[in-house]
Swiss-Prot record:
Keywords: 4Fe-4S, Amino-acid biosynthesis, Cysteine biosynthesis, Heme, Iron, Iron-sulfur, Metal-binding, NADP, Oxidoreductase
Source organism per UniProt: Salmonella heidelberg (strain SL476)
Keyword Iron: yes
Single Gene Ontology MF annotation: NADP binding
InterPro entries linked to this entry: CysI, NiRdtase/SiRdtase_haem-b_fer, Nit/Sulf_reduc_fer-like_dom_sf, NO2/SO3_Rdtase_4Fe4S_dom, NO2/SO3_Rdtase_4Fe4S_prot, NO2/SO3_Rdtase_4Fe4S_sf, NO2/SO3_Rdtase_FeS/sirohaem_BS
Matching PANTHER family: SULFITE REDUCTASE [NADPH] SUBUNIT BETA (PTHR11493:SF47), SULFITE REDUCTASE [NADPH] SUBUNIT BETA-RELATED (PTHR11493)
GO biological process: cysteine biosynthetic process; hydrogen sulfide biosynthetic process; sulfate assimilation
The protein, known as: Sulfite reductase [NADPH] hemoprotein beta-component
Subunit structure: Alpha(8)-beta(8). The alpha component is a flavoprotein, the beta component is a hemoprotein.
Cofactor binding remark: Binds 1 siroheme per subunit. Binds 1 [4Fe-4S] cluster per subunit.
Amino acid sequence: MSEKHPGPLVVEGKLSDAERMKLESNYLRGTIAEDLNDGLTGGFKGDNFLLIRFHGMYQQDDRDIRAERAAQKLEPRHAMLLRCRLPGGVITTTQWQAIDKFAADNTIYGSIRLTNRQTFQFHGILKKNVKPVHQMLHSVGLDALATANDMNRNVLCTSNPYESQLHAEAYEWAKKISEHLLPRTRAYAEIWLDQEKVATTDEEPILGQTYLPRKFKTTVVIPPQNDIDLHANDMNFVAIAENGKLVGFNLLVGGGLSIEHGNKKTYARTASEFGYLPLEHTLAVAEAVVTTQRDWGNRTDRKNAKTKYTLERVGLETFKAEVERRAGIKFEPIRPYEFTGRGDRIGWVKGIDNNWHLTLFIENGRILDYPGRPLKTGLLEIAKIHQGEFRITANQNLIIASVPESQKAKIETLARDHGLMNAVSAQRENSMACVSFPTCPLAMAEAERFLPSFTDKVEAILEKHGIPDEHIVMRVTGCPNGCGRAMLAEIGLVGKAPGRYNLHLGGNRIGTRIPRMYKENITEPDILASLGELIGRWAKEREAGEGFGDFTVRAGIIRPVLDPARDFWE
């Protein structure tokens, strides 16, 4: 990025309506409690439609039947998505059994959706079941607070089953950061858990009365794995270890992938290195980054409000100096680190603690009983006998963690009998999509329902060119908000309209480069024609170990994005 054009620290102007809503909400209460009792509509009205997001929910409807219901003069079939707060993706088997039962008994779709933010979502919760879902989560020690809207969202942590001691330390920090940055309002407990109102005034010492200007995402990452895709996140703590023990973090700030089609003020951006900090300063630094973004982020234009834009406007050195001032530290020079991959190691891995860990590939994270593959039942049966925990990965897979040797055969038998260990290609293991249709209101094109058959066709191209065991990191996202993280893929498809996508190429396998748009608004046959030609060239012309994305850059097929604020749209 450039320091040549620093802008104002605070953007003056008329505040966005979201700022009015937050200010008037009485610390996120609004009239949600009253709205719950309105049986005339299946949805939430007015500001409450947006306020429920702070409580971990989005109001959606089934877009497959929207037109049909409109023709019948019925309102859309409103139902809520709920996203759990689950730092590092760790969930106990007792908790898993509770969420399995709720999904079966109280959701329209009956599924559990693992997400690439290391948590799970329920889709299709009717309004009458909204309060019960929060109470169910609370009863097993979980909540949905701050998993959506203008807060620090679910904190990610590398799912490294081999480095068990290091993972345990990093996971503890992910939990501490998550807890430290949580909102302090009692609105969640009052509305959902029926806790009595306390006479004291609410205060938000970190987030402030109007919370953050926009969503904020945090990771703790253990090199050499970049499984959590740090460059998609606002604030990243890269673990630095000595003799297998965590000693501190490198801090990287200002990553983010969401854009708006045709809006050249928006761009995907990788995170910038700030420096190294010893462990004892972690929470102070996390708070300083968040409060600097709170005070300097753009509250007049939500499309330009994320940390990545603040960093570009004020300049990296200015932002970094303010974080140092607020945290009371000076960053040390970045310590050496490198990434070698970001996919999950599917199958059994033995940890240095001699426990076994079984990583199960879950296509698109959708846990459901399919014909001949009862995945949901299989995981429930494993949860009933497993003494360790489950870990949800940022690749939408699931790890059965900490399995003793004596239980290994029994758990493998259950997994195999329920279709949880069916062999899949390396290409399928490295392909991912967001939910999109039918539930996401922002979806422009299919993603989760499109990817499996599209992957079949890409597998056929690899087979045709004699490289069936190769893989290309491939992501499909249904709209430019980018939940599928296509903007860090070697092949990224971004939904433009039904059946049409923008094709991005030139990312790399380790997730440190933004791909550039190669072709705009094209159909699946056009995409496959382009990929067929380019994969053929890659198979013939690549250098030893060269990934597809690196090849497209070296061969001059695509220019690399070097400074997204300046050249993302070129």
